[in-house]
Every structure is written in C-alpha cells, then in structure tokens.
C-alpha cells in the first residue's frame, strides 16, 4: 500500500512495506553501533582457551563480540574480566563485532592473568650421557661429558649390553613365565580328566 503526502509542495511517497521494515528491531541500531567511531566499555567475559568473548559498552548498547585477533597487545592476546577498553565495532550478520580493541587510552590492553591449559604430555627419554630418564638428550645434559658406564646399574667396569644384573632380571622373568606355563598346562590336564 502506498501513502502520498505533500510537504512544502513536494510529493513524498512511502510504502507500507518500508514502514514495517523500519519497525524491525534489527534495523533500529543506533548510529554509534554501526559506525567505526571509538566507544568505551568493559570486558564482560573472555574465554582465553577459545580466544573470544564479549564487551559491554558504557553507553548501554548491545553486547559486542570480540575476537583475540583484534586486541592490540603484544604476546598472548586476551582480555581480563571487567577490563576497561576502548573499541570500534561494526554490524555483521551475527550482530555487533569489534574491529579494534585497545586500552582505555589507546595503548596495549592489560590482558587476562589466566592462560589456557595445554594438554601436552611430557616426553621422557633416556639421556645417554647421565643415564637418567629426563626431558633432555645427551647433547643438552647439564652434567657435561661422563665416562662410559652401564646405564642399568651405573657400574663403570662394563656397559649395558654386558650388565650382570640384566641376566638376573631376565632369569626372574623367565622363571615366572615357565611357572605360569606349567600351572596353566596342569589346569588344562585336570579339566580334560574331568570330562
């Protein structure tokens, strides 16, 4: 439906469709939310592991999404809870998104005190210099060059391949496996006799 109004001798045409679209809440964004002007606000929350969070503007507008890539600071970029910032934002299909975030006076942000937890297993390897299971290799060993010795018993009169303790531990494991085999064969014989 089309409405015609006369203003100062000029014809002004409006359609009912445009009047309903102006009532749409998505189109009622204030000019400060749409422009790239500098706004002040606080960090509502920020997930340091995922690298994003939300800002609450001081002027009471809609919350603004912030990604770590737009935060101005060196090193690990994050925001502390309730940290005061100044930011620029733009409207996207998902809502308001920050395009630049800095400290209140335009400098680097302070950032969060938390760091994401890294699920990294420590790799334990044997240092062939000191013989310890540690997180270093022989070229990085703090003890310096050591004399050749057995890494199993630390004896300096022989090497690991010729260690007398190696045979003792092998004979114990062999005797255990032999006794396990004999007991399992005896159990099989008893079950066969019962049937």
UniProtKB/Swiss-Prot annotation:
Location in or out of the cell: Cytoplasm
GO cellular component: cytoplasm; cytoplasmic stress granule; cytosol; nucleus
Principal subcellular localisation of the protein: cytoplasm
Keyword Nucleotide-binding recorded: no
PROSITE patterns in the record: CSD_2
Start-end of Low complexity biased regions: 170-188
Positions that bind Zn(2+) 1: 127, 130, 136, 141
Sequence ranges assigned to domain CSD in this UniProt record: 38-104
Stored SUPFAM superfamilies: Nucleic acid-binding proteins (SSF50249), Retrovirus zinc finger-like domains (SSF57756)
Region annotation (Disordered) ranges: 1-31, 164-195
Residues binding Zn(2+) 2: 150, 153, 158, 163
Keyword annotations: Cytoplasm, Metal-binding, Repeat, Zinc, Zinc-finger
Claim: Nucleotidyltransferase is one of the keywords in the record: no
Molecular-function annotations in GO: mRNA 3'-UTR binding; mRNA binding; zinc ion binding
Family to which the UniProt record says this protein belongs: Belongs to the lin-28 family.
PANTHER family, per database record: PROTEIN LIN-28, PROTEIN LIN-28 HOMOLOG
Protein name, as recorded: Protein lin-28 homolog
Protein's organism: Drosophila melanogaster (Fruit fly)
């Amino acid at each position: 439906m089309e409405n015609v109004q006369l203003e100062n001798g000029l014809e002004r045409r409006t359609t009912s469709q445009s009047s309903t679209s102006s009532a749409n809440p998505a189109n009622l964004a204030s000019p400060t939310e749409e422009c790239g002007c500098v706004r002040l606000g606080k960090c509502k929350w920020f997930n340091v592991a995922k690298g994003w969070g939300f800002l609450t503007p001081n002027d009471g507008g809609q919350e603004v999404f912030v990604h770590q890539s737009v935060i101005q600071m060196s090193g690990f970029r994050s925001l502390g809870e309730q940290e005061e910032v100044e930011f620029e934002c733009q409207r996207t299909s998902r809502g308001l998104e920050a395009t630049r975030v800095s400290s209140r006076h335009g400098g680097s942000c302070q950032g969060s005190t938390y760091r994401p937890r890294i699920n990294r297993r420590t790799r334990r390897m044997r240092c062939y210099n000191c013989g310890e299971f540690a997180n270093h290799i022989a070229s990085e060993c703090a003890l310096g060059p050591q004399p050749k010795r057995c890494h199993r018993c630390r004896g300096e009169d022989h090497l690991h391949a010729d260690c007398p303790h190696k045979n003792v531990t092998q004979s114990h494991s062999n005797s255990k496996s032999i006794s396990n085999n004999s007991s399992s064969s005896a159990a099989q014989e008893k079950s066969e006799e019962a049937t």
